[in-house]
Amino acid sequence: LRPTAPVADNTVIRYERSGGIAGRTSSWTIYASGRVVDGAGVETKADQAKLAALVTIARDPKTLALTSPAGRGCPDCFKYTVSIQTPGANVSLVTYDGVTNPPELDALLLALAEVTR
């Protein structure tokens, strides 16, 4: 038997938070390798434990089956846009402060906040 190279994890997560009192937009692209690039192009390395938790949630079939919850923005609220690209699926989700999200989406948003702090 010939050893095979490990399969690269090509999971990419794009996360944008916009609105709030100041009306600001912040965005990040997070790679499973740990590379995090913010909207200004500044690159950092994610904490490995926080990244592992995020990637596990993002690749969960329940997360990949989500659709955006019904809801709309409100004054001074944040809008959250998340796109997940995996080798087998592409998902885009939008939600807002004050919307009742499925538990999988809440877990994803919490993990994203941890990685992008």
Model-flagged regions — what are they?
Residues 19-31:
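Short, solvent-exposed loop/hinge segments that bridge or flank secondary-structure elements
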Residues 1-20, 42-45, 49-52, 56-57, ...:
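Short, well-ordered, aromatic-rich surface patches in folded extracellular/luminal domains
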Residues 28-42, 89-91:
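Acidic/histidine-rich, surface-exposed loop or edge segments in extracytoplasmic proteins
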